[in-house]
Amino acid sequence: MVKLGQLLASVPEVVAAAPWLAQESDRCPALGKIVTGLSTNSHACPPGTLFIGMPGTRVDGGEFWSGALEAGAIAAVVSEKALQKFPPQNGECVIAVPDLVPVCAGLAAAFYQHPAQTLQLVGVTGTNGKTTTSHLIEYFLNQQQRSSALLGTLYTRWPGYQKTATHTTPFATDLQKQLAEALQAGNQYAVMEVSSHALAQGRVLQCGFACAVFTNLTQDHLDFHGTMENYFAAKALLFKESYLQGRAVINQDDPYGQRLIDRLPLDQVYTYSVNDSTADFYTKDLDYQPTGVKGTFVTPQGEFPFLSPLVGQFNLANVLAAIASGLHLGLDPAAMVKDLLDFPGVPGRMEQVQIRPDQDISVMVDYAHTPDSLENALKAARPFIPGRLICIFGCGGDRDRTKRPLMGNIAAQLADLAVVTSDNPRTEDPEQILADVVQGISLDIEPWIIGDRATAIHKAIREAKPGDGVLIAGKGHEDYQILGTEKIHFDDREQAREALILRYS
């Protein structure tokens, strides 16, 4: 355990903002108290907590420092604006700093004894493919007895532990705590999905990465970043010296990936490509099959025939990224290729829903929720569907509106039947979201427009003809739907199973 004064003094930005900490301990008697935890939530401050009041997009959390202290916090670190607005009246220990982002990360890393300095971290960033790529890397590491934690969109997990995630990349206080717990559990590695939000908000400050992977960059999150250049700039932060301490693994087929490659020293980069033989890692002799892909990996350590259980070219790129990362981390490439055959897959990623051996239609659930990922999923499914390809999809509310007509156009062009439905409308009008999507669909194409997602899934599966394929896109692993401000239970896979049972009853 650490005393408050010692913890605060370990962060240079705090010392610079409050030099009196070193000389005037009587000004803040709490400096001698033991810190039992960190919290950015003023309502969750048990006795002994240090409250860190982070500014948000709508409100400055630091303005609630008094509530945090009343709840049990021994001190608060807040923004200068918050302290000016609500100055201490009774000698409370409240410290203002100009920029809370590095301070929060610094305090969290120090409190949890800098777990990232012991763990070997692998960071995976990109619009699409983060989850599958990170699962593959974690799988390859564990298969070769390199114990690894996984932190990402679905969960934080390691052998014997799993907890559902609330964010793709946790906030700094939670992230450092999870890394410390992973280290304490005996893990040597931690494979992390690193979102653009996390990079822009400094959540992964105090983390140095032995390997950083860039999968691709396509339109998403423009409600947050504003422009594609801002979005790219956020992703590119992972490849700065402050984060990248080892090798970058970059998709050469992506134009933004090529820009990253051009910025970095050649000996610090592994490039990969599905088709381009100038890359360090590429494939040849490909045979795309309904159950996966067969071919040959070409690597700096030789050629390896493979059979991957993951369908589609986009998944092949994810496998290449994982193989390249594993090779950099010292894994045996032949063993990785052998283990690939038994990779269990990722929940909600081109996940087949089948209730009987003689099922006469294919049903797949995928997380595709961007124009590029929807296109990839449809193209991956198309060759193996003898009948019609039916695509059920929607777009989330309170998110990037500009991608809605793009997704409508892609579904209409690549599927035989586009079924436009609700995703997570949140606080937007669901009918307006549907209208935005339909704007991208040519007038000579007639989509089904069914606002209720369960109804859309049941109707599509009920009316599918033998040989048809139904792709349910957008939610993947999610087991909820957000309507207004309410989160209700909803799972595309459960709905698909129910619809299939009714189809055959």
Swiss-Prot record:
Its EC number is 6.3.2.13. Keywords: ATP-binding, Cell cycle, Cell division, Cell shape, Cell wall biogenesis/degradation, Cytoplasm, Ligase, Magnesium, Nucleotide-binding, Peptidoglycan synthesis. Its cofactor is Mg(2+). UDP-N-acetyl-alpha-D-muramoyl-L-alanyl-D-glutamate binds at residues 42, 168-169, 195, 201, 203. SUPFAM superfamilies: MurD-like peptide ligases, catalytic domain, MurD-like peptide ligases, peptide-binding domain, MurE/MurF N-terminal domain. A motif (Meso-diaminopimelate recognition motif) lies at residues 423-426. The keyword Nucleotide-binding applies. Meso-2,6-diaminopimelate binds at residues 399, 423-426, 474, 478. NCBIfam families: murE, PRK00139.1-2, PRK00139.1-4. This is UDP-N-acetylmuramoyl-L-alanyl-D-glutamate--2,6-diaminopimelate ligase. It comes from Synechocystis sp. (strain ATCC 27184 / PCC 6803 / Kazusa).
